[in-house]
Regions:
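TRNA-recognition modules of translation machinery and tRNA-sensing kinases, especially anticodon-binding
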Residues: 37
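Lipid interaction determinants
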Residues: 1-32, 40-199
């Protein structure tokens, strides 16, 4: 499954406001909701979102398959960048490395029409991510390839958030068993992050 960005504001009293714009928990529209958070000790410091937040907890709620989206609501604190703009965490259940990045207020991006826009609100941030995704992964580009060591992979699915990597030159049967899938998330700086390392 693809990665989903959230915007969060933590206050000192334990309240967190979370915003999202995705098909899973917000119906494809921008929404905000407040709940609470805490830091607990569990073999390390853990950030826990300890009251239900519809926008965020939908990803960690089990569905009829017993798994749902496989998301987390508790995160082991792993460290901080030297400039203190990024906090590195790991999902306690999933083991996926994630980042909490300082909100990029004032950052510029190019919208779908090619105009330069500025991130002035949380809603603008989601518009910027959508514009970057549309610009990076559109039907004008015939295909993508990735080289890793001495192997080349055809890359597909970037526009829908799940990257499929298939080694070049395989038969259809071989490709079915050797295609690797990784969820991705598009960043404001036109980079993408994989949900797990590709080796």
């Amino acid at each position: 499954e693809q990665g989903y960005p959230f915007v969060m504001k933590f206050d000192k009293s334990g309240k967190v406001t979370i915003a999202g714009n995705n098909s899973v928990s917000t119906g494809g529209v921008y929404k905000e909701e407040s709940s609470t958070y805490d830091f607990v000790q569990d073999m390390s410091v853990v950030l826990t979102f300890d009251t239900y937040n519809e926008i965020f907890h939908e990803f960690s709620s089990p569905q009829t398959d017993g798994v749902g989206h496989g998301g987390d609501y508790e995160f082991q604190m792993k460290g901080m960048s030297a400039d203190k703009d990024t906090i590195y965490v790991m999902g306690k259940k999933s083991g996926i490395d994630m980042r909490l990045v300082r909100f990029p207020m004032g950052a510029q991006y190019t919208d779908a029409a090619g105009a330069t826009e500025t991130v002035g609100s949380w809603a603008d941030y989601f518009k910027a991510i959508e514009a970057n995704t549309a610009r990076l992964f559109n039907n004008k580009i015939s295909g993508y390839a990735l080289s890793s060591g001495d192997e080349t992979f055809d890359v597909d699915g970037l526009g829908v958030g799940v990257m499929a990597l298939t080694p070049v030159g395989l038969s259809e049967i071989e490709a079915a068993s050797r295609t690797y899938y990784r969820g991705i998330i598009v960043n404001l700086d036109n980079t993408i992050r994989l949900s797990s390392p590709f080796k």
